[in-house]
Swiss-Prot record:
Keywords: Aminoacyl-tRNA synthetase, ATP-binding, Cytoplasm, Ligase, Nucleotide-binding, Protein biosynthesis
Ligand binding (L-tryptophan): 135
Organism name: Salmonella typhimurium (strain LT2 / SGSC1412 / ATCC 700720)
Name of the protein this chain belongs to: Tryptophan--tRNA ligase
Lineage of the species this protein comes from: Bacteria, Pseudomonadati, Pseudomonadota, Gammaproteobacteria, Enterobacterales
Motif 'HIGH' region per UniProt: ranges: 12-20
Gene Ontology CC terms, in alphabetical order: cytosol
Keyword Isomerase (UniProt): no
Length: 334
């Protein structure tokens, strides 16, 4: 029986965080045995905001090494860089012609990013969801792991696929969202009602996977809790968002359940909780960073992973693009 195809990706434009790891990358790793996983470093999406060329190249290799350090295995999964497979951009252009201006105008992420990057509201930023649809549909993807911030984009991908299929027959699989049962939603350290984001301007809100352990300890000790007197370590996202976030992080790292942790910290101060979280996170990151540096220093291996991954991805992508071009009436290349 053929395994269902899973597609996901991350931009190389910012350092990945513990939120990316606990909420997504760890799930990607766990899916490798049961699914045919295709994981992409989406460098073409990254240039919708201005990038320094040298930094983008470095960040792409850094991200690849982090994928590997987190446990994504090139023997089990297809790992590649988006710009190495030209079919992404080719299908993206074709799908532009089956996507309505009004649909893109309603995308909340475009509104957010255009407010943030007001000096560079480019067509690529507006068109980003169509390239994302191409990324997904190119591989006849069955399942897409999505967070809250990408649900709207996946809905658009489904709409485009159904519209195209309605015109030309069953060219595309219509992808379904995959929402893992487990996976911590890690929030900002100082603003625990919003999700931790690698693009946050306030770096005290964020813990990067490559961050120095001393810096990690400092940030966690400064994390927002609350002013309850006496302090109560209790899981209550609405009333105690900061404490709940720290409990979520500790649970994700140690595997202990929230009720177990509540019992462990009964009658203790918030400082005790922060100390345990800091120790657990810095320990986890030390091990991950050791693996990261081993991969990052082996450039020949990284080049091989990229080359092999692009070849595997291209073979599958070419089949889909051929079917699309034939359906819309392009003359086949002699």
């Amino acid at each position: 029986m053929t395994k269902p195809i899973v597609f996901s990706g991350a931009q190389p434009s910012g350092e990945l965080t513990i939120g990316n790891y606990m909420g997504a990358l760890r799930q990607w790793v766990n899916m490798q045995d049961d699914y045919h996983c295709i994981y992409c470093i989406v460098d073409q999406h990254a240039i919708t905001v201005r990038q320094d060329a040298q930094q983008l190249r470095k960040a792409t290799l850094d991200t690849l090494a982090l994928y590997l350090a987190c446990g994504i295995d090139p023997e089990k999964s297809t790992i590649f860089v988006q710009s190495h497979v030209p079919e992404h951009a080719q299908l993206g252009w074709a799908l532009n012609c089956y996507t309505y201006f009004g649909e893109l105008s309603r995308m909340t992420q475009f509104k957010d990013k255009s407010a943030r990057y007001a000096e560079n509201i480019n067509a690529g930023l507006f068109d980003y969801p169509v390239l994302m649809a191409a990324d997904i549909l190119l591989y006849q993807t069955n399942l897409v792991p999505v967070g809250e911030d990408q649900k709207q984009h996946l809905e658009l991908s489904r709409d485009i696929a159904q519209r195209f299929n309605g015109l030309y027959g069953d060219i595309f699989k219509v992808p379904e969202p995959f929402i893992p049962k487990s996976g911590a939603r890690v929030m900002s350290l100082l603003e625990p009602t919003k999700k931790m984001s690698k693009s946050d301007d306030n770096r005290n809100n964020v813990i990067g996977l490559l961050e120095d352990p001393k810096s990690v300890v400092k940030k966690i000790k400064r994390a927002v809790t609350d002013s309850d007197e006496p302090p109560v370590v209790r899981y209550d996202v609405k009333e105690k968002a900061g404490v709940s976030n720290l409990l979520d992080i500790l649970s994700a790292v140690t595997g202990q359940s929230i009720p177990e942790l509540e019992k462990q910290f009964e009658g203790k101060m918030y400082g005790h909780l922060k100390g345990e979280v800091a120790e657990a996170v810095s320990g986890m990151l030390s091990e991950l960073q050791e693996r990261y540096h081993r991969f990052r220093n082996d450039e020949a291996f990284l080049q091989k992973v990229m080359k092999d991954g692009a070849e595997k991805a291209s073979a599958r992508a070419a089949e889909t693009l051929k079917a699309v071009y034939e359906a819309i009436g392009f003359v086949a290349k002699p």
